[in-house]
Each structure stands twice: as structure tokens, then as C-alpha cells.
Regions:
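Residues on the lipid-exposed face of transmembrane beta-strands in outer-membrane beta-barrel proteins
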Residues: 19-23, 58-62, 123-129, 184-190, ...
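Structural signature of Gram-negative outer-membrane beta-barrels, strongest in the C-terminal barrel
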Residues: 63-65, 179, 198-210, 246-366, ...
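Outer-membrane beta-barrel translocator/receptor signature
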Residues: 1-58, 64-68, 121, 355
Length: 424
């Protein structure tokens, strides 16, 4: 058994208590449990914005037999905070104004009107059964529900938003989001050899259902001041328009096959996945327009590496992706995004150590990803290219000292865009 309680006290009146308890329920160890949780009450770097969280995550494992195990999983999370992102105006931050500079922690919203309330819960299980010395079966199932209510004020956003006396024009944003998520993954794994080749074969079928109700309302909020903010303004007269208001049901069925092959120090991974995506949408902000689309795609992946006795493992990988994009525009759902990524890297683990050092460079291209334009509307971008470098170190330096360090550099640009957008 293991039991841990942690208490934190920090800046901005930060107070947090967390616990993690795990152990046997019976003497034979057929039933195991784990129960963790977090309670937090804190301020933030933004004036008048609190950060409160309550989280519980219980789990129960039943070792039904030597070859069979079932783990029940649960989670509940409640967040109650405000608009920490702030959306400060260009004038008074990057640009000088006669009124002066905006302090980094200044709240240009209205704590009497703004809030961020999120409730999330999930239930599921993980089932494992070994059929024989070669085959084993796994099934993972999860249902989750997200409810989000958010009101936030955006300050500025255009060249004339701030007057010489510090008065700032603002926008009022109201978000309502409800997402239910059901996922089940079934797979068989086979470990076997063919001559000098050792195989780990994975064959699976998964299903995902996502129902989304999303609404984003926007209106002109009462003005404030970047130096002496005005709180407690009357928002009852604000007229809102729906930037987004839709109901969307997505169903994704995927069939996948992967083989990891080992020959002496060589490692080769070959895999493929076929997806069938069904999307049905109703856009209430577009005269209740209805849209149904059916998409399918094959995605492949491959990786090759060589494990040296010295602990170095250089590798090269290629992967394709196919992913649904939530929402739509003009009464039509967005196309799924696709991607291709090449990665070249090296891993180093000193013999007899659990310290792992990794360095990698990658080139990623994605098509049909969704972004938000300056008017607040979402729209697809034809193609984005991201190139980057990643360095990472993890492990235990000594028995009492662990290390986690990372560095990431990315360079992204739009390589194909519509006529109405400029390349960056």
C-alpha cells in the first residue's frame, strides 16, 4: 500500500491539498484500488480572478484470474475560475498611449460579470484477457461528459480601440458548450516469431461517438479604462449575435493493423488504419441549416531504428493522420484534417540507467485545419507546415533526485491559403 498527502502554499494566495492512495483490498490481492484527488483555492496573476478546482479519480482493479483483469475507472472534475487570458489591447501594451501602460496583471474585464465554470466526469473500464501464449485481448471503454459555461470580456482588437484618455472599447463573449463522448477500443495482440524475426502484431477495431452543442454569442460591452478599470457595469442592454451556434453528431469507426518487427538490433514498425467518419450537423446561426457528410481515409505509419549496445538508438519515422474538425461555416461542416509527418531523431539511455535523452527534428504538414479569423469566425486553412526541434531528458539522476527537462523550437507557416488570407 502507498498513501500520500501533499499540501501547497504559494503566491497569489495559492492553497492546494492533494492525496493519492493505492493498495490491496483483500489479502490475496485480487482486488486493488487507487483513489486520488485535488482541492485548490487560489488567486491568479490577473487581479480579481480566482482559480478553484475540485478533482476526484477513483479506480478499482479485479484480478479475475491469472489471465484476466478488469479495471474500473472514474473521474470527476470541477473548475470555477475567470477570464485569465485577458485579451489586452495593442495600445497600452506593445504601443504607447498618452494614458500610459497597462500593468501585466490588470483586469480589463469585469469580475462581477465574467466567469468560467467547467464540470467534467468520466466512467470507463479496461479489460485484459490472455488467450494463450501468443494471443491476448484488450477492450477499453469510456464515457465522458463536459459542461462549460463561460463569459469573458475582450478589450481592444482594432486600431482605434483605446482613446487618449485610456477609455477602451470592449466585447462581451458568452460561451455554452456541452460535449458527450463515448469511445470503445477492441484489439488483439499476438507475440510470435517467424525464423529470425520477432513480431508484435496488433489488430484492432475502435468506435467513437461525439455529440456537441456549442454556442458563442458576441456583443459590444460597456467601455472601461486601461489605467483605472471600471467594474460593475450594467450588461443587461448588450445585444448579442451568434458567431457560432450548432449541434453536431460525429461517429468514427476505425480498423487498424500494426506489426513491430525485431531482427537482432533492428526495429521496424509498419502499420495502417482505415477510418470511416459520419458527421451530421444543424447550424442554428445559419437558419437551422442541416448538413451531412461521409468521409473515409487510409492512414499509414512506418518507423525504423537500430539499438546500439552503447545505448544509442537512432530512428526515422513517417506517420499520416486523419482527424475530425468540430464546427462548420456557411451551414456546412468542416472537412476532416489530414497530415503527414517525417521525424528523424536519436535516443540515448546509458547502460544500467533509467535516464533517457532524446533529440529529434520533424517536418509536419497538415491540410484543412480550422482556425479563427479576426472577425471571430472559424474557417479552414488549406495547408500548414510545422518544422521543429525537440530535446528532452527524463529519469532518475540519483535515488533521491529525478530529472525532467525539455526544449522545443517550432517554425510554422501557412503554405497554402485562400485568396482572402495572406501567408505568414
Amino acid at each position: 500500500s502507498s498513501h500520500e498527502v501533499q499540501v501547497q502554499i504559494g503566491n497569489y494566495q495559492h492553497k492546494q491539498i492533494s492525496f493519492d492512495s493505492t493498495g490491496k483490498i483483500d489479502d490475496d490481492g485480487r482486488f486493488l484500488y487507487r483513489f486520488s484527488g485535488v482541492g485548490r483555492d487560489s488567486g491568479t496573476t490577473v487581479e480579481h480572478i480566482d482559480d478553484q478546482r475540485f478533482n476526484l479519480a477513483p479506480s478499482l482493479t479485479w484480478n479475475i484470474a491469472d489471465e484476466t483483469r478488469l479495471t474500473l475507472l472514474g473521474q470527476f472534475n470541477r473548475d470555477d475560475t475567470g477570464g485569465t487570458s485577458q485579451f489586452l489591447p495593442l495600445q497600452g501594451t506593445k504601443l504607447d498611449t498618452p494614458a500610459g501602460k497597462v500593468d501585466y496583471n490588470k483586469n480589463l474585464g469585469d469580475p462581477d460579470w465574467e466567469f468560467y465554470d467547467k464540470t467534467f466526469y468520466a466512467l470507463g473500464y479496461a479489460f485484459e484477457h490472455r488467450l494463450d501464449d501468443i494471443w491476448q485481448f484488450r477492450q477499453n471503454l469510456r464515457y465522458s461528459k463536459l459542461e462549460l459555461d463561460n463569459q469573458i470580456i475582450t478589450a481592444g482588437g482594432w486600431s482605434g480601440a483605446v482613446s487618449d484618455d485610456g477609455s477602451v472599447s470592449r466585447g462581451a463573449n458568452v460561451y455554452d458548450e456541452n460535449i458527450s463522448h463515448f469511445a470503445v477500443d477492441n484489439n488483439f495482440q499476438a507475440d510470435f516469431s517467424t525464423g529470425a524475426l520477432d513480431h508484435t502484431l496488433l489488430l484492432g477495431l475502435d468506435y467513437l461517438r461525439v455529440n456537441t452543442d456549442y454556442r458563442w454569442l458576441y456583443g459590444s460591452a460597456p467601455s472601461s479604462n486601461i489605467i483605472t478599470p471600471i467594474y460593475g457595469r450594467d450588461f443587461s442592454g448588450v445585444t448579442y449575435g451568434a458567431l457560432q451556434d450548432y449541434n453536431q453528431k460525429r461517429r468514427n469507426t476505425g480498423l487498424y493493423l500494426q506489426d513491430q518487427i525485431a531482427l537482432d538490433a533492428w526495429r521496424l514498425t509498419l502499420g495502417g488504419r482505415w477510418d470511416r467518419l459520419e458527421t451530421d450537423s444543424v447550424f442554428h446561426n445559419a437558419s437551422d441549416a442541416k448538413d451531412s457528410r461521409r468521409d473515409s481515409q487510409f492512414s499509414g505509419n512506418a518507423a525504423l531504428s537500430y539499438v546500439f549496445d552503447s545505448g544509442f538508438t537512432p530512428y526515422l519515422s513517417y506517420a499520416e493522420s486523419f482527424q475530425a474538425e468540430a464546427g462548420g461555416s456557411g451551414g456546412e461542416a468542416f472537412k476532416p484534417s489530414t497530415g503527414k509527418q517525417y521525424e528523424l531523431g536519436v535516443k540515448y539511455q546509458p547502460p544500467g540507467s533509467d535516464l533517457l535523452l532524446t533529440a529529434a527534428v520533424y517536418d509536419l504538414k497538415r491540410q484543412n485545419i480550422v482556425t479563427t479569423n479576426v472577425a471571430g469566425a472559424t474557417e479552414p486553412v488549406s495547408e500548414v507546415q510545422v518544422r521543429g526541434l525537440e530535446l528532452e531528458a527524463t529519469g532518475n539522476v540519483t535515488e533521491n533526485l529525478s530529472l525532467t527537462a525539455s526544449y522545443t523550437y517550432t517554425n510554422s507557416k501557412m503554405t497554402e491559403v485562400g485568396d482572402s488570407r495572406d501567408k505568414n
